[in-house]
Every structure is written in C-alpha cells, then in structure tokens.
C-alpha cells in the first residue's frame, strides 16, 4: 500500500527559486517570535530545533522575514552555524521530505530500515557530511537506535533478556540518547496513570529537583488551560446553537468571547484548537 513516509507540515514556498535575501545588517537583539509564539521561548537548543521553530511561523510572517530573523539570531548567538545558503537548502530538503513517498508494507524491520535509508539518502542529496551531523546528527542516531530496539524484539529473546540487552546497548550511547530514552519511558509510565507523588519522584530521578518542579508547574498550567478552554467550548457551542442569532452575530459574539477569555497572544492558537474541535 502506498503510504507517505513522514507526516510533516508542507511548507508553502511556491517556487523554491523565489527565495530572496535582504542585505546583511549588523547583528542586533530582536524578538523574532511571531504573535502566536509569545507564550514560548525561542528554541535554539540545536540548529535543527531553531530552524523548525522559525519555520513554524510561516503564514504569520513572510519567508523573507523568517530568513532575515534566522541570520540575525545566528549573528547574535554565534553558535548555530547557520547562514542564508544553509537555510535555503533546508527549505528545499523539507519540501523534498514532504514529497517522499515509498512503499511501506507494514512495521517489519525491512520496511523501517528502508524508510531510514531513504531519509539518509535524501539528506546526502542536499547536505555535506558536516552539515548532516550539525542538523540531523541527533535525530538520525535516535532513529537508528529505535531500529536496533525493534531488531531485538524480533530475535526471539525473552522480555527480560530484551530489557537487559537494551540496557547494555543504551549504556554505550551518548548521554543525550540515554536521556531521550529515559524521558520516553517516563512519559509512557505517566500515561498509565500514577499517583502524583510517584510521578514527582520519578521526575526528580530523571531531571533533578528543579526540573521536576518546572514540570509540575507546566502540568498545572496545562490543566488550567484545558479547564478554561473546555468551558469556552461549552459557551461557544451555546452561541452556535442559538437559532435566534444570524451568522454574523454568532461570529461577533464568539470573537468577543475568545478575546475576553484568553490573552491576545493565544488567539491564533485558540482558533486552531476550535477548528480541531469542529473536526477540521
């Protein structure tokens, strides 16, 4: 069965050749976040994270502005090793990745390896070995690690043997890989529903006391947002179901409800969540 290899946001570039760059300017501190990102921090933990964070604003900001922001941020930080040419290559790669279509017959190892190799081959078409390591090094290693774990599950080992072999293999990996696996296990355990104290203690073990406290605050903020949003949806539904209102009146009342219920920086996010709640 024909199946798209990866689910990613297709970047609406129009013609990839129509990417223009503004003249160089002196480095300057500037808030490069779009309106919908004002409740987040700029993700510059890695070159790829920053590129994807920047591209997520496409639609709110023109591509030319995003390009200038990427270059300006690199000049300010001096750590990401990004320039106009590399950014343009990344745009072309993302489009090619979105178009990547290969034959997937299931979740067997051969199919997964085929997908993994197709991604590596595509990266080599656009980037040098040094650039691949800079942008995709961690992602590629984690994907290879997932393949290794899948191989173990198909080799007839008992559950306990698989766990021990996996721990041995993981111990040989870089620290960031081990942390990633630990976080994945934590999220899986949390999804199964543990009491708050057990959850907190596991977080302390994985990310330290300060990290666990930050995660707890995030949980509280997320729960509060969910509560407010669900109440908002109930009120919005009542407006939509009111037969005495015209479509224009409904639109105005919902807009007023949205703007009085949430901060301005959240409005675009709320509109997107409304579309999801409405089924698209």
Swiss-Prot record:
Any single biological process term in GO: lipid catabolic process
Protein's cellular compartments: Cell inner membrane
Transmembrane segments: 5-22
Annotated keywords: Cell inner membrane, Cell membrane, Chaperone, Lipid degradation, Lipid metabolism, Membrane, Transmembrane, Transmembrane helix
SUPFAM superfamilies membership: Lipase chaperone-like
MF term (GO), any: unfolded protein binding
InterPro entries per record: Lipase_chaperone
GO cellular component: plasma membrane
Topology in membrane: Single-pass membrane protein
Protein task: May be involved in the folding of the extracellular lipase during its passage through the periplasm.
Stored HAMAP family: Lipase_chap
Family: Belongs to the lipase chaperone family.
Protein name: Lipase chaperone
UniProt organism field: Vibrio vulnificus (strain CMCP6)
Record gene name: lifO
């Amino acid at each position: 069965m024909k199946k798209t290899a990866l689910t990613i946001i297709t970047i609406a570039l129009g013609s990839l050749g129509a990417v223009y760059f503004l003249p160089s300017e002196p480095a300057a501190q500037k808030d490069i976040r779009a309106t919908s990102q004002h409740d987040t921090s700029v993700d510059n933990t890695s070159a790829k994270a920053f590129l994807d964070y920047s591209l997520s604003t496409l639609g709110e900001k023109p591509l030319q502005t995003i390009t200038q922001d990427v270059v300006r941020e690199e000049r300010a930080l001096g750590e990401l090793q990004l320039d106009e040419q590399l950014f343009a290559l990344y745009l072309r790669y993302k489009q090619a990745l979105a178009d990547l279509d290969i034959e997937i017959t299931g979740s067997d190892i051969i199919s997964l390896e085929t997908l993994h190799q197709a991604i590596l081959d595509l990266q080599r078409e656009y980037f040098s070995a040094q650039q691949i390591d800079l942008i995709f090094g961690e992602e590629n290693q984690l994907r290879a690690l997932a393949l290794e774990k899948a191989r173990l599950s198909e080799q007839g080992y008992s559950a306990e043997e698989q766990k021990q072999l996996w721990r041995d293999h993981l111990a040989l990996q870089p620290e960031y890989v081990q942390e990633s696996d630990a976080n994945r296990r934590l999220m899986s355990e949390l999804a199964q529903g543990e009491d708050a104290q057990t959850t907190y203690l596991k977080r302390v073990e994985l990310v330290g006391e300060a990290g666990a406290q930050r995660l707890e605050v995030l949980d509280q903020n997320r729960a509060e947002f969910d509560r407010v949003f669900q109440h908002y949806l109930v009120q919005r539904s009542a407006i939509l179901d009111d037969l005495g209102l015209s479509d224009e009146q409904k639109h105005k009342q919902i807009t007023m409800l949205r703007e009085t219920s949430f901060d301005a920086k959240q409005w675009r996010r709320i509109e997107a969540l409304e579309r999801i709640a409405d089924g698209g």
